Amino acid sequence: MKVNTLPLAAITGQEAVKLALTLAAVDPGLKGVAIAGRRGTGKTVLARGLRHLLPPIDQLEGCPCHCNPAEPHSWCNRCRERFTEESGLSDSEVPVVQRNAPFSEVPLGATEDRLLGAIDVEQSLAGGVRAWQPGLLGEANRGVLYIDQLNLLDDGLVNSLFDAMSGTCRLEREGISVQYPSNFVLIGTYDPDEGGLRGHLADRIAMHVSSGVIVDLEQRLEIMRRQELFSEAPEDFFDLYNDEQEQTLRRIEKARTVLPQVTISEAQTLYLIGQSLKRGVPGHRADLFSVRLAKAHAAWQGRTAVEPIDLAVAVEFVIKPRQTVDLPDEEEQMQPPPPPPPPPPPPEPDKPDDPETPPDEAPKDEQTLQLPEEFFFDAEEVPMEDELLSLQNKVQRQARGGAHGKQKSLERGRYARALLPPPGKNSRVAVDATLRAAAPYQRQRRESGQYGDRQVIVTNSDIRAKQFVRKSGALIIFVVDASGSMAFNRMSSAKGAVSVLLNEAYVNRDKVALIIFRGQQAETLVPPTRSVELAKKRFDQVPVGGGSPLAGAIAQAIEVGVNSIGSDVGQVIITLITDGRGNVPMDPQAGPKNREQLNEEILALSRLVPENGFSMLVIDTANKFTSTGFAKKIADAAFAQYYYLPKMTAASLAETVKSGVHALRK
C-alpha cells in the first residue's frame, strides 16, 4: 500500500478536529466539517487522515459514480441505461463489487468541467456519440470531497458545490443532459485571516471546528519526531499505527450499524432548540444538525440513547459556531448585581479671585488666546456595539457571496471555463472544450468524405475560447482633510475610523492609499499598498493645521488611481473625508483666487472622477453651524455617495464608509 498521508491516529493533539472527522464518517448525513486554522496548524494533514477511516462500500460494477445497488432511484444515467428492465437483468443479477470509499480532492484552480463533468472525448471520438464522464462531484459520491482553502474557491464553483450538496447533480451542457448522485461528506479547510466561508455554504456544513496552535513543548517535540519518522519510511511508520487505525475503522462500522437505533427524548431535543434560540442561531438547519450529531456521538460511544455529553458535543460543534449573540458565563450569571454607583461629589463652591495675582499677569478674559499652528490627535478607540458588529458581519457576508475581487479576461489569469469566441476579440483556444464540442460529430464528418483522411475533424463551429479569472481587488484611496478647520471636527475620530477601515481592506484583499491635505499642498502619505501597519503608522503621525488644499487633494487622488488601474486593481474608490472648506488653489504659485474661483476649480476636478471610471464617497464632517454645504456639491459633481456626519465618532464614520464602499463595489 502506497502511503502519502499521516494516519489520523498518529496526529498529536487536535482532539476536537479528530472527533468531528470521525463523527462525519459515522453519519455522512451531517454533510461535512469545516476546519478553520492558521497556516501550519495541520488542517490538511487532519483532513487527509480521514481517507483511511472510511468503511468500504458496495457499488455497481464499472460505475465511476459509485452508485449504490440498494438505491436504484438514485443511479446515474449510465447505470440506468445498463441495468434497466430492458437489459434482462434482475436485481440479484446486477453486478456488484466492493471498493474503498472514494476520497476526492478539489484543487483551487479546478474548472467547472472538472468539477461537474463533461463530454468524454475518447469515447465520443471512438463511438461518434455524446458520452459523458463525471467530474469530481460524481467521483466523490458516497465518500469524501476535500477542498483546501474553501473560502477562496471561485464563486461559480461554490454555487455548483452548493447545488450538489442536495444529493443530486444535474449536468446540462454541450448537448448532453445527465443526472448522477452526489452524496458526499465535504471536508473544507481554510485560514480565517484570508476571509470566512460564504454564509449559504457554511450553513450546509454541520460541524465547524478550529485547529489551534499547539503550545506544549513536549507535544511540539513529539510532532517533529513523528514527522521525521514518517518522512524517512512512510509504510513502516503507518504500520506502527495500523492496529489503532483498524480498531477505529471497526468502531466506525459498528457505530453506523447502531445509529438507526439511537433515540433522543423530546426534552433533549427542546434543549438543543433552546440553545439555538438563546444564541441567536438563524434558521432550522442547526436544530436538525445538532440532533443528528448528538445521535452520531451516542452511536460512536456504543449507546442507543442520547446522554448529556452527546448534547454538549452537538452544542460545541454545531450551535456555538453559528451563534450571533454573546452569552454571559455561568459564573457571571450567578453573581449578584453590582452595587449602585456612589453619588457624585457635591460641586465645589466658586473660589474667590486670588488677591495675589502677580502684577505682570493679565486677567484671563483679557489675555490673547494663543493657538498652536499644528495639533496632534491620537486615534480614537472604536467601540463596536452589537448592532454595529451585526451589520458589519452582514456586509462582509454579502461581499463574499458575490463576485467581489474577481476579474474575467480573455488574456490572462486562471483558466476557469470555456465559451464561444466573442466576435472581434482575440482569444486563446480552449483545446479541451473544442475537442469535446467536435467529438460527437466525428463519424458523421468522416462519412461525408469532405475532409479526406483526417483523424480528428474540427470546424469553426467547434472552436471554444478560454475565459480566465484573476484576482482584482479594489484600490481604496482615503483622502483626509488635515487642515486647521478639521482640528475642531474630531480629527481623532477620523484617525480611529481609518484604522478600522484599513483592517477591513486587508481582509478583503484590497489595496489602500492615503492622501492627506493641509497647509499649501496635498501629500500621498501612503502609496497603494496592502501593508496595514505601514498605513497606520504614518497616519498616526499626521499633524493637523494650516490651510485646506482640497483641489490639489482631489487631483492627486485621481492621479494615483489612474496610475494604479489595471494589473491587480480592477476598481478605484476615492473616500473623501472633509468639511468642504477648501481655501488653497490647485497652484498656490499662480496667485490668490476668490471663493467662487476656488469652488469652481474644485468642482471641475470632481467631475473628472466619474470620467475616469472611478467611484467616490464623500463624508461631510462640517459643523452644522459653520457648514457651507459645499461638500454636497462636490458629491453631486462626482456622482458620489454623500453622507453628512456633523457629530462624527470613529464608530459611526467607520461603519458609514464600510457601508458606502460595499455599495460602490462592482
Curated annotation (Swiss-Prot):
Enzyme Commission (EC) number: 6.6.1.1
Reaction catalysed by this enzyme: protoporphyrin IX + Mg(2+) + ATP + H2O = Mg-protoporphyrin IX + ADP + phosphate + 3 H(+)
Superkingdom, natural source: Bacteria
GO biological process, one term: bacteriochlorophyll biosynthetic process
Pathway in which the depicted protein is active: Porphyrin-containing compound metabolism; bacteriochlorophyll biosynthesis
Binding-site positions, ATP: 37-44
SUPFAM superfamilies cross-referenced by the UniProt entry: Formin homology 2 domain (FH2 domain) (SSF101447), P-loop containing nucleoside triphosphate hydrolases (SSF52540), vWA-like (SSF53300)
Keywords: ATP-binding, Bacteriochlorophyll biosynthesis, Chlorophyll biosynthesis, Ligase, Nucleotide-binding, Photosynthesis
VWFA domain residues: 475-661
Matches recorded under InterPro entries: BchD/ChlD_VWA, ChlI/MoxR_AAA_lid, Mg_chelatase_ATPase-dsu, Mg_chelatse_chII-like_cat_dom, P-loop_NTPase, VWF_A, vWFA_dom_sf
Keyword S-adenosyl-L-methionine: no
Region described as Disordered: 327-367
Family that this chain belongs to: Belongs to the Mg-chelatase subunits D/I family.
Known function: Involved in bacteriochlorophyll biosynthesis; introduces a magnesium ion into protoporphyrin IX to yield Mg-protoporphyrin IX.
Name assigned to this protein: Magnesium-chelatase 67 kDa subunit
Natural source organism: Heliobacterium mobile (Heliobacillus mobilis)
Lineage, top ranks: Bacteria, Bacillati, Bacillota, Clostridia, Eubacteriales
